[in-house]
Amino acid sequence: SSDLPNEIKDAGIPIFNVDTAVIEDDIENFVTQFVGTNAYMAGQLVGEQMAKDYPDGADIAILDFPSNESCVDRVNGFLDGLGDNKDKFNIVAQQDGEAALDASMSLAEDIITANTDLQAFFCINDPSALGAAAAVKAANKTGQIGVYSIDASPDGKQALLDGEFTAVACQVPVQIAEYAFNAAQKYVGGDTTIDEKKVYLDSHLVLKDEAKQTVNDWQ
């Protein structure tokens, strides 16, 4: 029922919110602690890598997912990560790939067709990037059009190893689960001090060596 959060709160039961944050009011009123990946940082790392890969700038496309706050943070981080070279990057398209492979593939095909000088895609997650990579492959442009992603899922790592992804920054769901579990255990055990209401764990770029060693796992 809609009153369930109040019932949980009244019963003195802690709520640990992981990965995707509930709305701000609910965090304030009901959540003991939120634990997620630093989405802005993940985007920033990818933007910095793209700026290194294209020092003279490039025509790029962004497949976003504006209805999800974390994905908006990733795009903002990415744009800031381009840094001083940001003005050299021409965003020829920014469209909602719905964080999904099929929708992103269809959009990417149209973007590639309409923009013969396109040099790279930034996608907000691996399913979206896998769709873009499939469109790039269908156009025989693997290696010519870069695909930059965030997640580093097993499928994303394989795509990196296969040369279909150029770079990928990681989500850290395993670390999130471990952190939240330990925090909850501590809380239930009687230590109810919460240093930070919201905890954002660091992202990093997953390079091929790490991808090879952890290809079947999340981090």
Predicted region positions:
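Structured segments of extracytoplasmic/periplasmic soluble domains
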Residues: E7, A11-P14, V18-A21, Q49-G57, ...
